[in-house]
Every structure is written in structure tokens, then in C-alpha cells.
């Protein structure tokens, strides 16, 4: 178990000095959606480093074998976080993007379904992993990553997201006994 007392079932305590680097884009990717754009944060080295440090802090003493980063912006955060935590990185991709044999997990969208995949030999059974994504919205993608990890019989020590959209209640799809850190919440 880790010492992630601030992330078990809750979000962080409030905005940080870099939170202004996340901007709202109205009507993207479709009308009625307000998109949380993290690219201004990514382009500012010191603020990006501060955000990563906040994401990493609760997991620094947790033994990990890898970070699972969910496509696409979860790759950016996940790979950087894996380096910060001195562990491996495993990409969780959209269908048909990984060569070789993959495991597939389907999940529900508002209208229809989608899938994510990872290599079936990415990690040995029992490996300890942290799942990372940029935004927790409805929780479908994060829940699908849990399904992939379960197929490989991985031990999920927790999940970390940069932003949680509270109104969409994605946290309700997460496991109650597995810590979930949202560095910022809106």
C-alpha cells in the first residue's frame, strides 16, 4: 500500500499556481462541450515540472513496476511521470496502433462503444502499476484501463489524473479501495 492519504477517494485541496495554464475551449470537440486544454501548461517548462511533481508526490514511496499511460495526453503525462518515479512506461492505445499481439478492452461511450489496447506481453502477471490520464470525465476510459490491467492480472496501486470534471461523476466508476488522485478539479 502507499501513503497516498490525500488521494484516497478525493481530489486535491485546490488550485495551484499553474492551474491558470489550463484553458477552456468552448464547443470542442463538438458543440456544447467545454474542453480543458492542457497544452499551455505543457509548453511552460517550470509549470509543467511543478504539475508533474504534484502528480508524483503521493506515489514516491510506492513500489511500482510501470505507469500505464492512456492515449493520447495520458502518454505525455504518463511517460513524464514514469521518469519522475523511476519506473517503466506502458502505452494504452486506441485500436490498431500497437504492433504485435494485444489485449483489447471495450467501453461504452455516450452513443456507442470504443476500445483500448495494450501489448499482451507488456508486463508480467502481478506487476504493480499506476494508471495515468489527463482528464477524468465520465470515467469510461479509466475503467477500461482497469479492465486491461485485470486481463493481465496486474496489481493496480492507483490512478493519477491531472484534471477531474466533478459534474460528470467519473469517480463513481472507479474502485473504492484503490486510490485515485486528481491534481485539480473543476
UniProtKB/Swiss-Prot annotation:
PROSITE patterns for this protein: PUR_PYR_PR_TRANSFER
EC number: 2.4.2.7
A GO cellular-component term linked to this record: cytoplasm
Electron transport in keyword set: no
Annotated compartments: Cytoplasm
Annotated family: Belongs to the purine/pyrimidine phosphoribosyltransferase family.
NCBIfam families: apt, PRK02304.1-3, PRK02304.1-5
Assembly information from the UniProt record: Homodimer.
Full protein name: Adenine phosphoribosyltransferase
Natural source organism: Xanthomonas campestris pv. campestris (strain B100)
